């Protein structure tokens, strides 16, 4: 049997019932990678030797009926900005080429404790800055549904690997849509948890008030199973929330009769393609058919999400990325003749164009004379966006809309046009600014390219999000599409 497109849930049961060994699962996954990844280009590094060794250890435990761990023997791919002890972590940048961490991120510790098996590290936009995975220093990942299209970003490798059947689940990070947008483009399920739900310890920081780690899977229930394994308060991350209700699967099958869902008119407004609008309207009718009430509302400050987000995120990035100075670790320019030259040349040569663009933007926004006009004003707009959501959630359980304004664009089309690229974040950035949970699930296709439907929930109410997404998934089954790729 081939396990390449099996769900996490099915693999757990197959291993538990001794119908397959962890070694067989891992072996099949590496065979799939060998066959497909030269085309998809989703992995930056494979941890094959350690993965095979780990799987053999799990085989022995399986034989003794000692199968402890929620993800016993399940292979995983990890975005390359999440620290993995002993495995190269580059953030897809020349700046960190050859950097091998000597400690483990919290999420990796949790996944290893649940006996998941690390397959390798996944490609991304450099330092998570981009929406197409084209800013990676190493390679350009393609969309498994259409090899002329981008997979989205910044977690493009994480989404493409899952869609192509190269891992049953992956982790990504989402600062302004970097899990949900590639999930939408690649036709899979991607969740950005509530800010603070998952520890950021060991996530290479981009924008600390926005970053959040989350799972990418091919089914909603798989997504919930992975989130259960990685949530929880962490003493190493002061922003991780002391909320210990990590049971997202018990209510997942409950119907959604009587649930109140809000559809913001702005989410079907200017810039959203006709195909996306049509798919979302169909999805709304499906939700009504499931017994939910869907009503149109207004989130008037949506249009300010992108400018506010790019000022705040770039400002935080300019601060966070100042640690890459060519001295302690990372790229060290061999041509520098003084300390000042070492700083300038290491950073100029080590960072790519998009990263430098955002550092410049952030430094400018924080500079004397401009701070009030840009950074401070953006924080005020952020509060207005949060207030919009709070007002809606007084009367509604969930917000629904498209994940992205269009389907995946062609490789090369927008890489030299940053403003057009940034516009793709129209519907995802407000969720990060408000710190809310958001999930993208497939809801259609246009010319063979997937369309994503986004559900947005109240803070720490991932349970309801999963319930709605799961019920919708029962009526819109996308699972057969992956094996056709």
Swiss-Prot record:
A GO cellular component entry from the record: glutamyl-tRNA(Gln) amidotransferase complex
Active site annotation, chain numbering: 79 (charge relay system), 154 (charge relay system), 178 (acyl-ester intermediate)
GO MF: ATP binding; glutaminyl-tRNA synthase (glutamine-hydrolyzing) activity
UniProt keywords, alphabetically: ATP-binding, Ligase, Nucleotide-binding, Protein biosynthesis
Top-rank taxon: Bacteria
Gene Ontology terms describing biological process: translation
InterPro entries listed in its UniProt record: Amidase, Amidase_CS, Amidase_dom, AS_sf, GatA
EC number of the protein: 6.3.5.7
Catalysed conversion reaction: L-glutamyl-tRNA(Gln) + L-glutamine + ATP + H2O = L-glutaminyl-tRNA(Gln) + L-glutamate + ADP + phosphate + H(+)
Purpose of the protein: Allows the formation of correctly charged Gln-tRNA(Gln) through the transamidation of misacylated Glu-tRNA(Gln) in organisms which lack glutaminyl-tRNA synthetase. The reaction takes place in the presence of glutamine and ATP through an activated gamma-phospho-Glu-tRNA(Gln).
Subunit and interaction comment: Heterotrimer of A, B and C subunits.
UniProt similarity note: Belongs to the amidase family. GatA subfamily.
The name this protein goes by in its record: Glutamyl-tRNA(Gln) amidotransferase subunit A
Upper classification of the organism: Bacteria, Bacillati, Bacillota, Bacilli, Bacillales
């Amino acid at each position: 049997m081939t396990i390449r497109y099996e769900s996490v849930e099915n693999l757990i049961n197959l291993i538990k019932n001794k119908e397959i060994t962890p070694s067989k699962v891992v072996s099949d996954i590496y065979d799939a990678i060998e066959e497909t990844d030269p085309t998809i280009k989703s992995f930056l590094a494979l941890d094959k030797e350690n993965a095979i060794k780990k799987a053999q250890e799990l085989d022995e435990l399986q034989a003794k009926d000692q199968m402890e761990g929620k993800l016993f023997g399940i292979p995983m791919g990890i975005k390359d900005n999440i620290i993995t002890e002993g495995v190269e972590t580059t953030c897809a940048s020349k700046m960190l080429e050859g950097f091998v961490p000597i400690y483990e991120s919290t999420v990796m510790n949790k996944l290893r404790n649940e006996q998941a098996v690390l397959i390798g590290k996944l490609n991304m936009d450099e330092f998570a800055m981009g929406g197409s995975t084209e800013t990676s220093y190493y390679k350009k990942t393609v969309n498994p549904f259409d090899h002329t299209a981008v997979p989205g970003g910044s977690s493009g490798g994480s989404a493409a690997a899952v869609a192509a059947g190269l891992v049953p689940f992956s982790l990504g990070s989402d600062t302004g849509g970097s899990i949900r947008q590639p999930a939408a483009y690649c036709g899979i399920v991607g969740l950005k948890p509530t800010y603070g739900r998952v520890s950021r310890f060991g996530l290479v920081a981009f924008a600390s008030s926005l970053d959040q780690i989350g799972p990418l899977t091919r089914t909603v229930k798989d997504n919930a199973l992975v989130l259960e394994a990685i949530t929880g308060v962490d003493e190493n991350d002061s922003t991780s929330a002391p909320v210990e209700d990590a049971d997202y699967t018990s209510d997942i099958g409950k119907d959604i009769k009587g649930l109140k869902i809000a559809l913001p008119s702005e989410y079907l407004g200017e810039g959203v393609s006709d195909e996306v609008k049509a798919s979302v309207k169909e999805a709304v009718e499906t939700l009504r058919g499931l017994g939910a009430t869907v009503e149109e509302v207004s989130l008037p400050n949506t249009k300010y999400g992108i400018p506010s987000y790019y000022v705040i995120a770039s400002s935080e990035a300019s601060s966070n990325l100042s640690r890459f100075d060519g001295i302690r670790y990372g790229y060290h320019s061999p041509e520098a003749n003084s300390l000042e030259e070492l700083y300038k040349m290491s950073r100029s040569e080590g960072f790519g164009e998009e990263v430098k663009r955002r550092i410049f933007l952030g430094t400018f926004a924080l500079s004397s004379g401009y701070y009030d006009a840009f950074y401070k004003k953006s924080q005020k707009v952020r509060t207005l966006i949060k207030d919009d959501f709070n007002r809606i959630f007084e009367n509604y359980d969930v917000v629904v809309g498209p994940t992205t304004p269009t389907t995946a664009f062609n490789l090369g089309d927008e890489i030299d046009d940053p403003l057009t690229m940034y516009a793709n974040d129209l519907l995802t950035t407000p969720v990060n600014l408000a710190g809310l949970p958001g999930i993208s699930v497939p809801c259609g296709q246009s010319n063979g390219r997937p369309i994503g439907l986004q559900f947005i929930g109240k803070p720490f109410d991932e349970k309801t999000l999963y319930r709605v997404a799961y019920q919708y998934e029962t009526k819109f089954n996308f699972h057969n599409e992956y094996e056709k790729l």
